[in-house]
Amino acid sequence: MDIEVDIIEFKVPLENNKTIFIWDIQPTFTEAYIYESLWSVYSAFGDLYLLKVCPNATVAEPGFYALVKFYSSAQASKAQRATDKQCLFQSSPLKVRLSTKQNLSFYSSKPLCLSKCHNLANHYLGFGGWTTRIVTLKDLSNCVDAGCQEETGDQGVLLKYGCIMELSFPHHGMSCQGVGVAEEVLDSDQDPEEKLRKRGALMKRAKDKAMEVAFEKVLLLILGNGKVAIEIKIDPDEIVPEENSERVIKVNDISWTHIESADSNAEEDFLWDLTEDLPY
């Protein structure tokens, strides 16, 4: 007999089969009450990436509709089948459908912000199921010999930090590493205390980006019996130096483009564009 396995990745769930719509929500309750009620119902099927409750358009009858995004297509499908035409928290049945809008190819993958990575890992692995450590954290502001010094103008001072983080899963005997970089150009006459604060913020940004990259490599395998296995995606072209290497970040043949573009603050900007067609 085949073992059922659900694969969950640490990326923004954009697929239609991970998104469900709920409508025919009565205006009897407040938006906050509806949110809490829906969260209580649907989080029982699996960890949720997003839940939004919105009032109906003015041309429609008074009431609300909701969007729920799961990390797992299997969990979304199970939730849809179990709750469609059910009253749940109100006196009349709800309509629950999977999204049907065609996805655009360039929205195929987007990494999770670090806070959501933590939530997802804690949900399936527990607070002791994973650990992190800094392999190296380097100041790259003056790495002229590595070819990474940039023109900042007469009034600018470049601050740049690079970090390698290790993500470990002690109960599974597995680990992976991620690389992150953060930079900012400061005014040369800026207050020294402000420069010190910016240095600390840049080091944290580099560390957080490295952690996001490390989580991107992880696959959670949810077995039919509820147990969780771990797999690590290996990129044969990736260059991650050894821990004891000197000048570990100072290389100029690693592309940081995909890291810099993964701005976590913008990850939800396009969510509604992908799921605006409500099936009836």
UniProtKB/Swiss-Prot annotation:
Question: Oligomeric state and partners?
Answer: Homodimer.
Q: What is the lineage of its organism?
A: Eukaryota, Metazoa, Chordata, Craniata, Vertebrata
Keyword terms, alphabetized: Cytoplasm, DNA-binding, Nucleus, RNA-binding
Organism of derivation:
Danio rerio
GO CC, any one term:
nucleolus
Q: What is this protein called?
A: RAD52 motif-containing protein 1
Task: Please classify the protein's predominant subcellular localization into one broad category.
Answer: nucleus
Q: Which InterPro entries match?
A: Nucleotide-bd_a/b_plait_sf (IPR012677), RBD_domain_sf (IPR035979), RDM1 (IPR040224), RDM1_RRM (IPR034200), RRM_dom (IPR000504)
Concerning SUPFAM superfamilies, the annotation shows: dsRNA-binding domain-like, RNA-binding domain, RBD
Physiological role: May confer resistance to the antitumor agent cisplatin. Binds to DNA and RNA.
Identify the domain of life. Eukaryota
Limits of the RRM domain: 18-101
Q: Where in the cell is it found?
A: Nucleus; Cytoplasm; Nucleus, Nucleolus
Q: Which Gene3D superfamilies match?
A: 3.30.70.330
Any idea which GO molecular function terms this record carries? DNA binding; RNA binding
